[in-house]
Amino acid sequence: MSTYSNIKIGIIQFPGSNTERETFMACTRAGMKPVEFLWNNDPNELSEFDGYIIVGGFSYEDRSRAGVIAALDPIMGQISIESEKNKPVLGICNGAQILVESGLVPGFENNQVGIALTDNKRVKDGQVLGVGYYNTWANLKMSAEPSRCAFTRSLEKDQIIKIPLAHGEGRFAMPESLLDNIIMNDQAVYLYCDEEGSTPNEFPVNPNGSLYNLAAVCNSKGNIMAMMPHPERTENGDQIFSSMKEFIQMGNPITDHVLVHNQESYSLKNYSVDESCTEWLVNMIITDNEAVSVQNILIQLGYDVVLTRQTHWEIKTAGENENILKKIKESGELYNSNKEFIGKRAANKETISILIHQKEDMHGRLKQESLTDRFQID
């Protein structure tokens, strides 16, 4: 264990990371020594540090899913090894997304991925106000016992702090059965709330539609936390960093909690379009950097693949089909004809197409409301 003045915290940064300056300042205010550590440094050098903070930003431009490419970098394998020594790891915003995609949170055996951080949704009185990126100040309630987590020790249970948030994919999502286990295990450590501490699950108190108003979740042992808001951007969040310091000074006192959950297994099924719907598969005219990034990481992992991406729309009309489809094309809502075009399914026998969509398609719902309300297309 380091002495007070020599507590070294590795500030982990990837291409596209930001807020490192604010994180340095927060660590310094807490009496810790922040040290920059880049994704392409020698991962073995991470053993020199007492703890780690993965900063916010947009690693690898959030391509594919926010945090997923960074989660596959070799540095995260070493972070996992260091966390097994009970060292504290804090992921803020994009850092939280990286921890979730790497499986370090919620903390299943072998770091199996169990939860997701998906697109924000802002819904009030049944109306979609917006999806995607949003920034505001939010009230957070610390909902666990102070000793539960490395990042709660300086706060009282039910204490409220007000800190900023700024993200596009910050909505915690998971199976209800897993959520129940996380709540019972006291891993739901910070919740969005109003000024009185109530937690109505609706915008604006819940700024991103997160399940159970989750703002931060820790792993079962309590030494790792994924937090979407930004405590480093304000002195209001300093207690999170002083908690980290105290945890290190006390010798990394983890808890004996164990997260048990039976993960469902999934298999691919053949998909057919509803006969009453028109299917549009939208291709990019320009280079699809997102597809290229995913292809490159798959090749690095040993998969010899060529990957392309299409956006899938299914349109069901109630009136004159061709006339309505023409109006939708002209609206530009579903695709931009300057850089996209309606393509076809791949016919090559060596090609497999996998359809991926959100369990709750907020983007589709927003587009439908826009076509109906803004363009008067029924």
Locate the predicted segments by residue.
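Amide-donor transfer/coupling interface in amidating biosynthetic enzymes
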Residues: 2, 41, 80-81, 116-272
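Structured core elements
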Residues: 10-13, 36, 53, 91, ...
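Short, solvent-exposed amphipathic alpha-helical segments in soluble enzyme
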Residues: 25-29, 179-181, 232, 242-243, ...
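Short, hydrophobic/aliphatic alpha-helical segments
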Residues: 75-84, 155, 275-277, 351-354
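A short alpha->loop->secondary-structure connector
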Residues: 106-117
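Non-catalytic terminal accessory/regulatory regions of metabolic enzymes
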Residues: 167, 250-378
